[in-house]
Structures are given as structure tokens and as C-alpha cells.
UniProtKB/Swiss-Prot annotation:
InterPro entries associated with the record: Ribosomal_eL44, Ribosomal_LSU_eL42, Ribosomal_zn-bd
Record region (Disordered): 36-56
GO biological process, one term: response to antibiotic
Family named by the database record: Belongs to the eukaryotic ribosomal protein eL42 family.
Protein name in the entry: Large ribosomal subunit protein eL42
GO cellular component terms, A-Z: ribonucleoprotein complex; ribosome
Pfam assignment, any one: Ribosomal_L44
Organism per entry: Phaffia rhodozyma (Yeast)
SUPFAM superfamilies: Zn-binding ribosomal proteins
Gene: RPL44
Signal peptide: none
Further remarks about this protein from its record: Confers resistance to cycloheximide, an inhibitor of polypeptide elongation.
Superkingdom of the organism of origin: Eukaryota
Amino acid sequence: MVNVPKTRRTYCKGKACKKHTPHKVTQYKKGKDSIFAQGKRRYDRKQSGYGGQTKPVFHKKAKTTKKVVLRLECSVCKYKMQMTLKRCKHFELGGDKKTKGAAISF
């Protein structure tokens, strides 16, 4: 379980700052694929009509986890940057901090 705080003081590369400032942390999410991308247009054209599936469907998935990508936004100049973490099964943003000697509860 990886628990990351919602704010983090780190270096800002923005033109206004160029110093350590508090950043707001969110988890990166992939945007919706455009239907106008060249590959998608070509694929849709090829798929239309009779003939079934025209390109191979990928089945040999090797990874069980994805790398977690954090999106950091400077609270001073609103400059945004991304930062990758290691692979993990469980990721939590701004969860409760662990205390020493506390019983584990699920």
C-alpha cells in the first residue's frame, strides 16, 4: 500500500518561481482517445463492411500493475508537472497516516 499526501513541498520549474513551493498532488488519468486520430480512422475504415476482425487482438499481457503517475500543480504559479512512482498494487492519495503500534484493520 502506497499512501501519498495531497500536498508536497518540491521544486517548481515555472518561470515565475524557480524555487521550492507547495504543490497540489493528484493522480494522472489517461484522457479519452480521439476518434479523429489517423490510426483510429484507418482502423475503423478497415473494420467496416464484411470480413470480421482485421487486425490482431492483443492477449499476451505481461504486467499486473501500472506505474503510478502523480500530477503536481504549483500553488503559486499553477505550473504543472508529472512524476512517476514505482509499480504498486494499491495506491492511496491523502489517506490516514500510520501510527506506531496501531492494530491493523481492514
